[in-house]
């Protein structure tokens, strides 16, 4: 018997996902298709009768708007929402804004996969002359971050290292109080939570593809260990296609 339930949702497709560009900390909004994905995710939660007590998200609008859309669909827009940079997407450094397929053609698919999916290899850092440096590093939403906290690039390991303290200190106590928690975030920050929950190896987490806009349900025991595999709310075909689309992002176009 599950002691707790936890629901995660990766934001719907963003405008830069649509253009196959590395988004990272750039504040790309949802594409029209991404907005529809978020609506369908919300409808799936509504149809399954889910209610929540508190929500967590990043400070990036694609995740925030996904959460808004879900809360609208389930008619729970009044719920408290905690936003934190610690749930932001991984910072892709110097790759930010580059088209993934073009980068794969230039550097090779293997190198792009290492940058995207290796556990501890960061991409090249974002230098001050990068076209999006000021847009990100000087943004006032990050004004309270120390120099050590504000990244110029991150590996998956780095992303998990800044997300997990928030999970342990802020989210876990809410779950243990019996609060029904919804987290709307990003592929890599959510991957960190999944790795922690399931005790996955570095190799396994590299291959994990979380689909956009599809609610992921965990049933947890009193020690917050999953009692069954993650469950996707949505029809099987939609889930399969979404996961394949995520896996295809770093491949060069033929």
UniProtKB/Swiss-Prot annotation:
Q: What is this protein called?
A: Phosphoglycerate mutase 1
Kindly list the positions annotated as binding substrate.
Answer: 10-17, 23-24, 62, 89-92, 100, 116-117, 187-188
PTM field: Acetylated at Lys-253, Lys-253 and Lys-254 under high glucose condition. Acetylation increases catalytic activity. Under glucose restriction SIRT1 levels dramatically increase and it deacetylates the enzyme.
Keyword tRNA-binding in the entry? The reply is no
Q: Any idea which residues are catalytic in this one? A: 11 (tele-phosphohistidine intermediate), 89 (proton donor/acceptor)
GO molecular function annotations of the record: bisphosphoglycerate mutase activity; hydrolase activity; phosphoglycerate mutase activity; protein kinase binding
In the record, N6-acetyllysine modifications are located at 106, 251, 253-254
Q: Which gene encodes it?
A: PGAM1
Q: What is its EC number?
A: 5.4.2.11, 5.4.2.4
């Amino acid at each position: 018997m599950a002691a707790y339930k936890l629901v995660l949702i990766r934001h719907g497709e963003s405008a830069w996902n649509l253009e196959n560009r590395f988004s990272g900390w750039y504040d790309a909004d949802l594409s029209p298709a991404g907005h529809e994905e978020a609506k369908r995710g919300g409808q799936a939660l509504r149809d399954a009768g889910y209610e929540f007590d508190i929500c967590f998200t990043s400070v990036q609008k694609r995740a925030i708007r996904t959460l808004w859309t879900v809360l609208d669909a389930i008619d729970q827009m009044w719920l408290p929402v905690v936003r934190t940079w610690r749930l932001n997407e991984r910072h892709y450094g110097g790759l930010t804004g580059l088209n993934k397929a073009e980068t794969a053609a230039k550097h090779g698919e293997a190198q792009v996969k290492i940058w995207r999916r290796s556990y501890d290899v960061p991409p090249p850092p974002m230098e001050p002359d990068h076209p999006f440096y000021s847009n990100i590093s000087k943004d006032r939403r990050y004004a309270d971050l120390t120099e050590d906290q504000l990244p110029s690039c991150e590996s998956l390991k780095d992303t998990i290292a800044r997300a997990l303290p928030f999970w342990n200190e802020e989210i876990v106590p809410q779950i243990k109080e019996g609060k029904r928690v919804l987290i709307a975030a990003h592929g890599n920050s959510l991957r960190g939570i999944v790795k922690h929950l399931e005790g996955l190896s570095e190799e396994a987490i590299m291959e994990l593809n979380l689909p956009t806009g599809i609610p992921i349900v965990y049933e947890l025991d009193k020690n917050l260990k999953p009692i069954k595999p993650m469950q996707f709310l949505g029809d099987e075909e939609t889930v399969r296609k979404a996961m394949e689309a995520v896996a295809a992002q770093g491949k060069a176009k033929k």
